[in-house]
Amino acid sequence: MANNKKRGGIVVFVVILLIAAGIGAYTIATDSSRYDGSAGFFNNFIVRKDYIASLYIEGVIETENKTYNHEWLIDTIRSLEDDEKNKAILLTVDSPGGGVYESDEVYLALRDYTEHTGRPIYAYMTTLAASGGYYISCAAETIYANRNTLTGSIGVIASQSVDMTELLKKLGVKVETITAGKNKNMLNINSPLTDEQRAIMQSIADEAYEQFTAIVAKSRGMKIGEVKKLADGRIYTASQAKKNGLVDEIGTWEDALSSLRKELDDDESVVTTYRYEKKDSLLEMLSEAVSKAGKTDALIPDAIRSELMLGISYPAYIYRK
């Protein structure tokens, strides 16, 4: 009898694992598919009428998070480019920015869309379209901002390091990292930055800054010197941004759509929404629940935890509150 109960418990455990694996596989499949918040999956096969793509770019621009998936976004832009039923893209941007690489790749994909199809791109900024969010918006021929939008933040964070050598020493913790190359360990929490290493990271920031300002100058029809006067990393209100030539109009999403329709001379095309939203697998939900229940971070002081979470180890066009 005991053996039967044991075997029964094993069977139940295996079934739970199989269900979790199945849900995980389903989640992966849906995450990598084109997701339309109003019409379901594989939207390009469903829509038969001419349409304007309402494409949302939300959250931190990186490989993947709850609201942003880089691979999905690039694939979606390229699919729209290949679809003759698509007549234009209306971007809705609500992002503090993100990685230099990801921001530039999205910008280039949008520019390719316009150059290869001749179709227009408009951008509408909501709460925040800063740094990389503004960088991507520069791919649009016309930029609308909500009257409460914060934008700009034209600048670069090359990296952020936290020097914890003194703290580790007080705690009696000794960290050893074996490397080859004198600068291989830079940005490590147990290795203070040298002047040479600061210069290395500054050169990376400067190069990314030159790229950013050149993109803005080209997009906005401004001289590079004019852009650099504005590009000190600060954010701008919508009215300030318009006054300085960083956006074209202040209005609503409907205003932007109306203007785009007027340019297209088209009141009949439907508007189809493309918006990424990650769905956690059962395993991810269980892992999060276990983590919260275990309170594994309880021993880390809040000030230190916040610094570690905000750490940036790659060049980023991002607005920091």
Regions found by a protein language model. Give the residues of each.
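Short, conserved acidic/polar surface loops in the N-terminal third of protein domains
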Residues: 102-103, 133-136, 156
